[in-house]
C-alpha cells in the first residue's frame, strides 16, 4: 500500500518510477565524451519530489523483516539519502567517508577504479557486531564503492541486509557483481546507457 505522500505526489497518474525518472536529468558527454551522466540533483531540489523519493525507500524499509538497525551512507550523495532515511526510520546513521576525512580510529578498504584506486573508511565504533545495516548510495555503476562499504561493515561484524540506490546503471555490471557477492540490492530506477 503506498504511503500518503506517494499517492498525493504521483502526479498526472504517473507511477512513482515514472515520476522519479522524469526528475532525473541526463547530461550528455559529461564528465567525458560518450558518457550519459544521470544527475539526481533535480530529485533533491523540489520538496515534493524529494518526499516521494524518500517515501519510496521508507515504504520498503518499514517492513520489519528488512528494517535496519543502522543506515550507512556512502560519500557523498549517500549521506543525503542515508541521513534522511535513518531519521525517518528512527535509527542511527553512519557515514562511510573517503580516506582521511574521519578524525577517530578507522578501518579502511581500497577498491579499484577505471584509472586507479580509491579508499573509503569507517570509524571502528560506527556499528556493533550483529547490527543489521542498510547501505545506501545514489547510484550503482561499477559497484566498487558499495562493495568496499559492505566489506568495511562486515569487518566490524555488522550484517549488511541490503544495498540500496536510486539509480542502477546495469550496463556497467556493478549490480551483477554486487549480487554475485551475496549482497541483496534494491534500486528505484534502472537506466541503460552510461
Swiss-Prot record:
Domain of life per record: Bacteria
Pathways involved: Purine metabolism; AMP biosynthesis via salvage pathway; AMP from adenine: step 1/1
EC supergroup of this enzyme: transferase
Main location: cytoplasm
Pfam families: Pribosyltran (PF00156)
InterPro entries listed in its UniProt record: Ade_phspho_trans, PRibTrfase_dom, PRTase-like, UPRTase/APRTase
GO process terms (BP): adenine salvage; AMP salvage; purine ribonucleoside salvage
GO function term, MF aspect, one: AMP binding
Annotated EC: 2.4.2.7
Subcellular location(s) per record: Cytoplasm
Protein keywords: Cytoplasm, Glycosyltransferase, Purine salvage, Transferase
Any single GO CC term annotated in Swiss-Prot or TrEMBL for this entry: cytoplasm
Catalysed transformations (reactions): AMP + diphosphate = 5-phospho-alpha-D-ribose 1-diphosphate + adenine
Keyword Cell inner membrane applies: no
Assigned protein family: Belongs to the purine/pyrimidine phosphoribosyltransferase family.
Subunit structure: Homodimer.
Function: Catalyzes a salvage reaction resulting in the formation of AMP, that is energically less costly than de novo synthesis.
Protein name: Adenine phosphoribosyltransferase
Source organism of the structure: Albidiferax ferrireducens (strain ATCC BAA-621 / DSM 15236 / T118) (Rhodoferax ferrireducens)
Organism lineage: Bacteria, Pseudomonadati, Pseudomonadota, Betaproteobacteria, Burkholderiales
Amino acid at each position: 500500500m503506498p504511503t500518503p505522500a506517494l499517492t498525493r505526489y504521483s502526479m498526472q497518474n504517473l507511477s512513482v518510477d515514472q515520476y522519479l525518472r522524469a526528475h532525473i536529468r541526463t547530461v550528455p558527454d559529461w564528465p567525458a565524451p560518450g558518457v550519459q551522466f544521470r544527475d539526481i540533483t533535480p530529485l533533491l531540489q523540489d520538496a515534493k519530489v524529494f518526499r516521494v523519493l524518500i517515501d519510496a525507500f521508507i515504504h520498503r524499509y518499514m517492513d520489519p523483516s528488512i528494517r535496519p538497525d543502522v543506515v550507512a551512507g556512502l560519500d557523498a550523495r549517500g549521506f543525503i539519502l542515508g541521513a534522511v532515511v535513518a531519521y525517518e526510520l528512527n535509527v542511527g546513521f553512519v557515514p562511510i567517508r573517503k580516506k582521511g576525512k574521519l578524525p577517530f580510529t578507522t578501518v579502511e578498504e581500497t577498491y579499484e577504479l577505471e584509472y586507479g584506486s580509491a579508499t573509503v573508511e569507517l570509524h571502528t565504533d560506527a556499528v556493533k557486531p550483529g547490527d543489521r545495516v542498510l547501505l545506501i548510495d545514489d547510484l550503482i555503476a561499477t559497484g566498487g564503492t558499495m562493495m568496499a562499504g559492505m566489506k568495511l561493515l562486515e569487518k566490524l561484524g555488522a550484517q549488511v541486509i541490503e544495498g540500496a540506490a536510486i539509480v542502477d546503471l546495469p550496463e556497467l555490471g556493478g549490480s551483477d557483481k554486487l549480487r554475485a557477492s551475496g549482497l541483496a540490492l534494491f534500486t528505484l530506477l534502472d537506466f541503460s546507457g552510461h
